[in-house]
Amino acid sequence: MIAIVDYGMGNLRSVEKGFLKVGVDARIVTDAASIDNADGVVLPGVGAFMDCIKNLSDMKLTEAIIKSIQKGKPYLGICLGLQVLFTESEEFGVCRGLNVFKGKVVRFPKMDLKVPHMGWNTLNIKKMPPIFNGIGGESYFYFVHSFYVAPEDEG
């Protein structure tokens, strides 16, 4: 069973429907025990970094998520669900993350680009991860975001 973590924000139903459509047993969960017992974890994300961290902490889910990752269970962080794995975010001042990965979540620099970044774009992938097996290298993905992760180790 894949645990889709409901921490009070996020696009839960669309993620759940996606898994069900491809025949994967995925359930929306709100407790640490369900995360511990799951074969993998999905943390969907829509909203502010600080609110996400506060909700995960208030619901006592942070430790279960970190332990699941440390055990090597598959983890899919969608947008904010990826960002909270990093050391900190500069959104609305500095806010500590789960520190699974060393690095920061930073706002796109002021340039001639529109922020938030919205629309269909390709990816510039340095090392192809297994999740992209069967997806063409020039595939398009939809984005709606104002921040990106800047890992300390880009490997």
Regions found by a protein language model. Name each.
Residues 38:
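An anion/phosphate-binding loop that grips the pyrophosphate of nucleotide cofactors and donors
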Residues 47-119:
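Cysteine-nucleophile active-site neighborhood
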Residues 42-44:
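Structural motif
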Residues 34-35, 68:
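Structural alpha-helical scaffold elements that stabilize or flank donor/cofactor-binding regions
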Residues 2-24:
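N-terminal beta1-alpha1 ligand-phosphate binding loop
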Residues 89-155:
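Pocket-forming structural segment of enzyme catalytic cores
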Residues 4, 75-77, 141:
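Short glycine-aspartate micro-motif
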